[in-house]
Structures are given as structure tokens and as C-alpha cells.
Amino acid sequence: MSGTSKESLGHGGLPGLGKTCLTTMDTKLNMLNEKVDQLLHFQEDVTEKLQSMCRDMGHLERGLHRLEASRAPGPGGADGVPHIDTQAGWPEVLELVRAMQQDAAQHGARLEALFRMVAAVDRAIALVGATFQKSKVADFLMQGRVPWRRGSPGDSPEENKERVEEEGGKPKHVLSTSGVQSDAREPGEESQKADVLEGTAERLPPIRASGLGADPAQAVVSPGQGDGVPGPAQAFPGHLPLPTKVEAKAPETPSENLRTGLELAPAPGRVNVVSPSLEVAPGAGQGASSSRPDPEPLEEGTRLTPGPGPQCPGPPGLPAQARATHSGGETPPRISIHIQEMDTPGEMLMTGRGSLGPTLTTEAPAAAQPGKQGPPGTGRCLQAPGTEPGEQTPEGARELSPLQESSSPGGVKAEEEQRAGAEPGTRPSLARSDDNDHEVGALGLQQGKSPGAGNPEPEQDCAARAPVRAEAVRRMPPGAEAGSVVLDDSPAPPAPFEHRVVSVKETSISAGYEVCQHEVLGGGRFGQVHRCTEKSTGLPLAAKIIKVKSAKDREDVKNEINIMNQLSHVNLIQLYDAFESKHSCTLVMEYVDGGELFDRITDEKYHLTELDVVLFTRQICEGVHYLHQHYILHLDLKPENILCVNQTGHQIKIIDFGLARRYKPREKLKVNFGTPEFLAPEVVNYEFVSFPTDMWSVGVITYMLLSGLSPFLGETDAETMNFIVNCSWDFDADTFEGLSEEAKDFVSRLLVKEKSCRMSATQCLKHEWLNNLPAKASRSKTRLKSQLLLQKYIAQRKWKKHFYVVTAANRLRKFPTSP
């Protein structure tokens, strides 16, 4: 039986309801097709109207130029009679002047309303200012100084200088997570000052952040401190004590001056509150060690402060105790805010008088780089304050934060003698136990000895730990080195010019552009791409020279121009200008110098990780998603048509829209072109193509990025197409061994023979493999640039808040105790 008879029987066998449904569906599809065509025609009409408007504006501009030229006095224009053509243009000029007058009146009304608004705001500000002027506290906070304290015994040139620095109010250092210390001197405890002036010093037990409310009455006063003369157990400024481990149950004798987490002040009534960082400072030149092991890990802000709190002014040659006796007067209570910084080389310290001064620190850059830290149990000796720059410790051996130098309150002469007799090996250093036991958190300072004392144990300890540190650096896990790798996940930069609607010009490109014929950026079946520069602006661009042999070739070029005129996306190349000649057409486009993505795949020196492929694939899907939203099929997606913005980043741009087509629902589009190994089965079978055709190519590109292999490549084009038609591919066991199941699922859902079963671009962007980038980066021991920028922004905001708090507290401490 013939095919015609079968068809007639088939139609006759259908029920009437089915025929009605098919007819209704065809009618609706026809209506939808007509609406899409109407939209396209409307868009073309709008484009034509805009172009005609531009032409009219050009004509108007030329008319104005002619009018200005006619008003200028000519050689024979003494009679002042206007020309006939000039008189014809006067009515239009009058209309334009009237329109300008109306616009000026409208703008004047708007400016008047804006002026009234500004006047109201000025009155409100004046009211607020008057309210603040009546407030004594607000006036003090705004000015930052107290007039009635001028000339008080507590003022000094140093304090005046610090006030000037405070009035500037500009932050000079970046502040990371910092602890705040407040030192308060109670008026009721001034009676104990005599004990301190006689040479006594207090020994306070260690206080953690949880014990901020410790009673200062528990302080034990121990003699042994003279009036500045170094005692037998005192350390010199150049001969600072070495830290060592301290037993958990060490006896506390009155001769010791132990202090962990508290600052030794000249007055016994001064109580230091440490939260949450620990500040270690030897008081009055004595070494200090921890009285019991601290189970909590040390904060990054642990520092060795240079001196014991604020000192009263006096002769510079006197010791601290003598200067305190010299001032004599009673000092009102003060609050000292200590800010600890770990992000910048210079540290900012709010001293007892509220100054912002740099402190001497021993920087440990590895504290801010977790990827370069060694294991927690690794023993390490921190660089001494007097160490030369060439004597720095290895980066892998640093984990604790910098310590500040400690200074002795002795006189200048005694200080010079002590510095002369000091040994290089007796500088302060921070030690941590090598075994990972409960002594890891113990921190101590051991009294340094003179050369005659013969106690080289701390120096030998550091020397013995040197090979251990080197071995620890060698045994660092590979993830520690990878922790410093930062991946740029920022979006691709936009074109250096605004999106424009380009029309073909029938002039030579050499009139406005300088084409570098010797510099070829790429090429293909169409011709070559050269680098060019716009003469008027110097803008670097790319000139795509297409050979034209027939009218069909010109239509293809115009189709490419029309498609690129509708594209404005950061992942799609932008068109800048177009020229047409007898034998060629030239498209001037955006220039990127990162090379083809295909070069990244084939380059043996460049190692693509799975996270790199995720960043590339996500941007490809974003560009394809934009194309499909505008009913455009690329139909030639391959690594050669994807350019990288730079040599190292992950930003890409899709190029070559020569084979792109506009998709229409009722139009059965068939194509028989493209690169064989990237063709979809429907293209090989010469069937209807649609959006899933591009998604097949995305799947092939992703497979190549992950493995470096082509899934369907055969020895010949015929074999390749046979593999594609049968959809015969698999995951190579060697290349896909370490890849995640999410990546395999992503590829498997794209390389499907049935095009209706493939993922769309929207579904790809929602796939689990292309999302949760921070979690994937943390698993691969890398960091994302977006995370670093976010952390930097948060740190800046936190720094500003802390700076304002410190400034306000530093001013509030200057209030007198009684009105």
C-alpha cells in the first residue's frame, strides 16, 4: 500500500476530538509565530526611527552652523541684507528658542524648590548645632580637649603632641581582631602610692578574659626593687630575658615578679583588664613567667609591651620611680586603651596618656598566612627585637603573634652599661613545647644572665630546635602551600566602550583606524583577525576581515552584525564598527589579549584544576544563557571560539557569531556546518536544531576542560560523526579518577542523544557543581578573590568602629573626678 493511502487511513482513524485539538494547537502556534514576527518588525522599526532621529539631529546641527556663519559679517555684508536660505531657517530657530525658554523656566522652578529644601535643611542643622552647643559633653566630644585642664601638673609636651594626633582623627593602620585593655586607677587607693615610690612592685596573678572582675586587693607586694639601680635579678634593656617553659606547679616566692596578661603599673592600685588578648610585660626590668599552664590557646594579639603604663613627667635622666617621685601630684583616674594590630608592620598603641604611637614589635608575617604555618606542636623561637633582618626565623616555624619589646626603668647611664655587657643570645624569644601535650599553651619569660653567669641553656635550646623546625617545614602538608593560592572568580570586565548599534559603512577602514597587518590574532574559514587602533582615541581593538565572494556571503556578514547589535553581555564579545568594500567586509570588535581557551587546555605548563574548570564553565553557561534569552543560537561553540580576558585569570568571552541564527518557534532550522567533534547528533542527522544544540557543545567543552580529551574524536571525520550519532562516549578511567561525582553528573546530563533530555543553560547555572564555590575552594585549599575582598571590606568597617570607640574613650578619660 502506498504512503498516501496509509496517511489517509491514519487521518481517518483519528477521533474528532483529536483533530480539533491538533487544529487548535496549530492555530495557537501560528498566532505565537505572528506575535514574534510582529515584535521583530517592531524592533526593526524602532531601530530605523532612532537612526532617522540621529540623522535629523545632524541636519539640525548643520543648519545651526549655517545660521551662525550667516550672522558673521562677510566681505560684502555691509548692507546687512540676509540671504534667502537663511530667512527660510528662522522659524525653526525661533521654535527652538521658545522650547529652550520653556525648559529654562522648568529648570528654574526646580532649582527654586531645591533652594527651599536646602534652606529647610540648613535651619534643621542650625537647630541641631544649637542643641549641641548647649551640651557640655557634646562640645567636649566634638573639640577633643578640656580647657580647664590646661596647665595641670599632668600635662606634658608629649601629651600635647598626642592631642594634636588625636585631633587629626585619621586612621593610619589597618586594624584586625584586637583586644582592648583598660587601665583604671582608683582614687581610694592613692594611699598605697608611697609603697611603690619606696621601691616596691606588685605581683598580680594571671587573669584570663573570663576573669575580668579579679580583685586588685589580691596583689602581693614583693620588695627587691630599688630606686633605679639594677639588682642581682634584674635584666638590662639590651640583655632581655629569654622565655622558657614553666612547670604548672612552680612555687610562687615573694622574690619572683610573675605577671601574665597584666601590665605592671607604677601604682599598686592600678588594675589592668585584659580581654581577650594577653599582654606580657616584665615590670621594672624583672623577668616574668607563667605561674600555671593556660589551657586556652594564645591569642594572636599576645604582645610584650615596652614599658609599665603611663609615667609622670620629670627629668629625662631619672629612673621611672624617681620620675614618679618628682611629679608628686595626684593624678586623676585614666583609661588606657591598647590596640593590637597584626596586619601592618607598625603597631599603634594607645598609651597611658592616650597617644597614638608606634611600638617596637617583632613581626611574624606567617600569623596572617595560615597556609604557611607549621603543625601546632612544632617548636619555634621568635626573632628577638635586636636581631638583624637577615636573621629572621623560617616562615613555617612562626605561629605565635609578635611580642613587643620590654624596657627597663633604669637611667640612661645604667642602660648604656647594661647594653654593653649584654649577649646576643640572651634576647627575649617566645618558646612552645615540641610535644603536643598540655604544655603547649604555657608561656614564660626566663631571667637572662650576664656572660659570667654561664647559663647557655636557652640559646642551646633554640639551636637544638633549628633542625626540628627545618624538618617541620619539609614535612608540611601540600595543602599548606596551596592555602596561599588565590583564584580570581570575579566576572569578566565589560568592553571599554558602551554598547552601540552598528551600521555598515561603505568607506575604507584606514580612514579612522590603523590596522596592524603584521599582527595576526587569529584566523579561520572567514579570513583573519588583526589588531587595530582607533586613531582618534588610541583605543586598542580587533579587526575581523571577512572575504566576500558572493551576495550570500554579504548576507551572512550582515546577519552577524545584526545579531551582535543585540548582544550586550560581559561574556560576549562586543561590536564597535563595521566597514564594507568590494571584496571584503571588516568588523571592528572588542580586543582581549588572553588567547584562546583551547591554548589553556593544550598547554602542558598550565595545570587546570576542577575549580578552574568550574569557573570557566559557569561563565560559558552565563553567556549561552544570555544568547538563548534573546532567541539566538550560536551553533559553533568550541574552545577556539572562547577567548580568555588575560593569561592567568578565569574570565572568558565568547566570539565568532558568523554561524549564529535567530531561533523562531515555527521555523524548522537545519544547518550542516560546524566543527565535526563539537556537532550535536541533530546537526549530523540534518534534523531541526534548537537551544539544546548549544548545550551539547557546552558538554563537550566541559569534558575537554576536565580531562584534556575529546569525547567523540575519531581517526577520521566519518568515524567522529559515527560516534556522535550513536552517542558512544565514556569517562576515561585515568583522567576522571580524582574528579567529583558532581562534575561527572554535569557532563552526563548534557551529552544526551535526545535533545529534549539535556539540561538548559538555566538548569546548568543551578546545578550543584557550578554553585557553592567557597565550600569547593576550602576543600581544595584555595581562596577566592571575592572572599578576600569581602573580608577586607568587613575589616575596614570593623576598624572604623573600633577607631571611633577608642577615640571616644580616650577623650572621656580626660574628665575630672569632680565637677
Curated annotation (Swiss-Prot):
Residue spans of biased composition, Basic and acidic residues class: 158-170, 183-196
GO function terms (MF aspect): ATP binding; calcium/calmodulin-dependent protein kinase activity; myosin light chain kinase activity
Pfam families: Pkinase
Reactions the enzyme catalyzes: L-seryl-[myosin light chain] + ATP = O-phospho-L-seryl-[myosin light chain] + ADP + H(+); L-threonyl-[myosin light chain] + ATP = O-phospho-L-threonyl-[myosin light chain] + ADP + H(+)
Segments of skewed composition (Pro residues): 307-318
Broad class of where this protein is predominantly found: cytoplasm
Cofactor: Mg(2+)
Entry keyword set: ATP-binding, Cytoplasm, Kinase, Magnesium, Nucleotide-binding, Phosphoprotein, Serine/threonine-protein kinase, Transferase
SUPFAM superfamilies, per the entry: Protein kinase-like (PK-like)
Catalytic residue list: 636
Tissues with expression: Restricted to heart.
Ligand binding (ATP): 521-529, 544
Residues with PTM Phosphoserine: 152, 355, 401, 408
Known EC number: 2.7.11.18
PTM comment: Phosphorylated on serine residues.
Described function: Kinase that phosphorylates MYL2 in vitro. Promotes sarcomere formation in cardiomyocytes and increases cardiomyocyte contractility.
Protein name: Myosin light chain kinase 3
Organism: Homo sapiens
Annotated gene: MYLK3
